[in-house]
Regions:
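A sequence-level/structural motif corresponding to short, flexible coil/turn segments enriched
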Residues: 21-269
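Bacterial Sec-dependent N-terminal signal peptides
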Residues: 1-24
């Protein structure tokens, strides 16, 4: 077993102990193997990068697995019960592997109100532009075929903003009251990075009634802390929250070329 899976899943175990035993800082010995879980997915290099918990107390861990660059990566999701055991009624004995693209980075996993599972990240084929993606699974780990194409929804920034020739990196997403998905990140260009925002409907279709045909790439008209107009600014959205009034709160970092302090935080609604 490779060390990467040991380190990533050990971190998962430490999060578990902090939830249950924050007051003592001791391992929960009744969880996994004396408080630690080690899972080898397919004798491969595995990277756990997102974690959440469902309403029954089951823990879901998401990330990527690969046997080598030529074969590419796959999304994995593993589900554990509150004792740290793989849930055999989820996926294939507690684990699922799903091919999405050659290169994948998982950013977040979260639960829908109805028990469905959302996984978001960035994906691209070899020598192709990276795009946002959202994968939706049913509660048993099966891809939800009513969402996107066979459970997978992707952004189309490279088509709508072809002139930028950038990769689009997802940093966060959230779910609103109507199960719409709002996702934010940045285009990683050779020039100034810009905020990227997209909205998907509950069926995984880009909501063309939102902003500019469902998407936005650009820098917000932000003033710096001295209330001076920013001439050239680089904005990267790192967090989004869907508010109860139907609006979205987006936060991130901006770089300002004509400011005394180059880096500042921004929040827009």
């Amino acid at each position: 077993m490779r060390q990467s899976i040991r380190y990533t899943l050990l971190f998962f175990a430490l999060i578990k102990l902090q939830i249950n035993y924050a007051q003592t800082g001791k391992l929960a010995l009744n969880f996994g193997n004396n408080g630690v879980i080690i899972t080898d997915l397919q004798q491969s290099t595995d990277y756990a990068s997102a974690i959440t918990m469902d309403k029954s107390g089951n823990v879901l861990v998401a990330g990527t697995t690969e046997k080598g660059y030529d074969t590419g990566k796959q999304v994995f999701v593993a589900q554990y019960n509150n004792r740290g055991q793989l849930q055999t009624n989820f996926g294939n004995n507690g684990k699922i592997l799903i091919p999405v693209a050659h290169q994948i980075r998982i950013t977040k996993i979260m639960m829908q109100y109805d028990g469905k599972i959302l996984i978001g990240g960035t994906a691209n084929e070899k020598d192709k532009t990276a795009e946002f993606f959202i994968l939706r699974l049913l509660a048993d780990g099966t891809p939800d075929k009513t969402f996107g194409i066979n459970g997978l929804a992707k952004s189309k920034f490279a088509v709508a903003y072809a002139a930028t020739k950038s990769n689009y990196i997802l940093n966060d997403f959230d779910l609103d009251f109507y199960n719409n998905i709002i996702a934010v990140g940045a285009n990683n260009s050779s020039m100034l990075d810009q905020t990227a925002i997209i909205k998907f409907t509950p069926s995984g279709i880009i909501d063309e009634n939102f902003l500019f045909e469902g998407m936005y790439v650009g820098s917000f008209p932000i003033t710096n802390s001295n209330n001076k107009n920013v001439i050239n600014n680089s904005c990267t959205a790192t967090k989004v929250v869907a508010l109860s009034n139907g609006t979205y709160l987006v936060g991130g970092t901006q770089y300002m070329s004509n400011a005394n302090s180059a880096f500042e935080n921004f929040t827009v609604q």
